[in-house]
């Protein structure tokens, strides 16, 4: 995600065990975790948040559960499956993002009157064609036309330090070259060193792309010898949603939000730890008072 010669501000994140780590830390802090209790709606009393309505699915017969709370923090992620899967329209769960993230938090906030921003501007990511797994910047290679020409002017050979930023600048490139007949576009890793390819493979494991790694192993797809066709995936909602203030609070008093469902702050990994901590700390101090 960096131009050659400019500061590289993005870090690799080893998130393969993040759920285990976060759950362990939450339990250490004394957090009570309600599994199999998806929240259906938020509860407002006299214009302020008062709790949430959940559906208890822990038994054979579901039942509603009312959870009273002085403060509520929404961190339900992005909104996927609003559009058919670009690579496989008949398989909606073949999506680059978590198919369980369906915009529940954005909808719940909207239903109680929380201010929303940027919802009309969905985002499109990219990755291997048909096998929907995002993380194009994890690939250490350059983008090429079918005849071998470089797609962009930035680098002729990619390394783990400087990748090909072409499709960050020209984010519709994969679709454009199909539409104008010059495509498709391929990621070419054949010039990358064995050390960089090993680093790339490790990065894929860290970023949840293990299914892609397994598929390449099973099918004999070797990035050191084979180019991989890329495509632009279907639109989804990330970094669009509830508007928050500097403390992470929405326009509904007592309701906070962080992460992919926030509409006026950076989403993704850069956003949720920072504003998750800010919202959590602010909500806790406010509730204590």
Where are these predicted regions, by residue range?
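Glycine-rich loop(s) and the adjacent beta-strand/alpha-helix scaffold that form part
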Residues: 74-132, 269-282
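Mobile, glycine/GP-rich and aromatic-enriched active-site lid/loop segments adjacent to catalytic centers
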Residues: 1-40, 48, 63, 118-274
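Short hydrophobic core segments
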Residues: 65-77, 109, 256
